[in-house]
Curated annotation (Swiss-Prot):
Forms a complex with TRM82. The gene is TRM8. GO terms for molecular function: tRNA (guanine(46)-N7)-methyltransferase activity; tRNA binding. Keywords: Methyltransferase, Nucleus, RNA-binding, S-adenosyl-L-methionine, Transferase, tRNA processing, tRNA-binding. It is found in: Nucleus. Catalyzes the formation of N(7)-methylguanine at position 46 (m7G46) in tRNA. It comes from Lodderomyces elongisporus (strain ATCC 11503 / CBS 2605 / JCM 1781 / NBRC 1676 / NRRL YB-4239) (Yeast). Pathway: tRNA modification; N(7)-methylguanine-tRNA biosynthesis. Its EC number is 2.1.1.33. The active site is at residue 203. S-adenosyl-L-methionine binds at residues 121, 144-145, 180-181, 200, 278-280. Belongs to the class I-like SAM-binding methyltransferase superfamily. TrmB family. Residues 1-19 have a biased composition (Polar residues). This is tRNA (guanine-N(7)-)-methyltransferase.
Amino acid sequence: MSSTAPLDSKATEQITTAAESKHNETQATRRKRYREAQEQTRNKHLRFQASPTPEEASPELPSDEVAKLPQKRFYRQRAHSNPFSDHNLEYPVLPSQMDWSTIYPHYTPASLRKVEIADIGCGFGGLLIDLGPQFPESLILGMEIRVQVTNYVQDRLIALREIHKADAYNYDNLGVIRGNAMKFLPNFFTKGQLSKMFFCFPDPHFKQRKHKARIITNTLLSEYAYVLREGGVVYTITDVEDLHNWMVKHLDEHPLFERLSKEWEEQDPCVKIMYNSTEEGQKVARNQGSKYVACYKRLPNPDDCE
């Protein structure tokens, strides 16, 4: 009767390494196949739905192609992205040159309204999804710099539109673009176009030398004031108290913004939505962390008050 000789430690290590390599390769292959399939669905959907006239319309997609919500595990991405890097982003030279019908494919260019609400750094789209039904007559845009996260939100919106296509509300007023709001915001929006801007759980950039990359600075606030109409509101929320104090300090010091009261925040429906909708906010709640909110109203330009 023969017996199998025990493997030495080197052979065991080689087998373990080979198994791990095969597992990682399988995961990467699955992720690649999934992304390719989602991209094909995304391109088909946009091409079919963006046709401006019934004569040019293409056949509808089979429901099983788009009705499934995307899975986050196939959209792996770093938590943050350097806003000063060259990301090869596409952006219009002027807002008038932007083709919004590609972002809101159920609207023809003739019927398309202007975007009124912007979620800057929209992440996985939780706030967008909850804001949409509250403002069905307003176009709401998410801006996200990370490519795979943007793709996830696009695929999520495509699936939601298909799932709810027979409902009174079907998420047609929501859109997302990959863009860098710190560089190109005025390329997308005209003066006084927006009524609300949301900054939810932005990158805190803890190191002092990185503070210049924070989404709220004196220079950027002037750009936000340019695209925000008088009486419009800037919403901020974070779980980092130091960042909250930073944002409050800079907004307090800017002449075109005035902080709204705690009573106003308690009554505003957008604050309630912002507090609980984002994936980051839900993670903070699970970890029993604190959330810091500050909302500011856009004041009239000084020249207009004279």
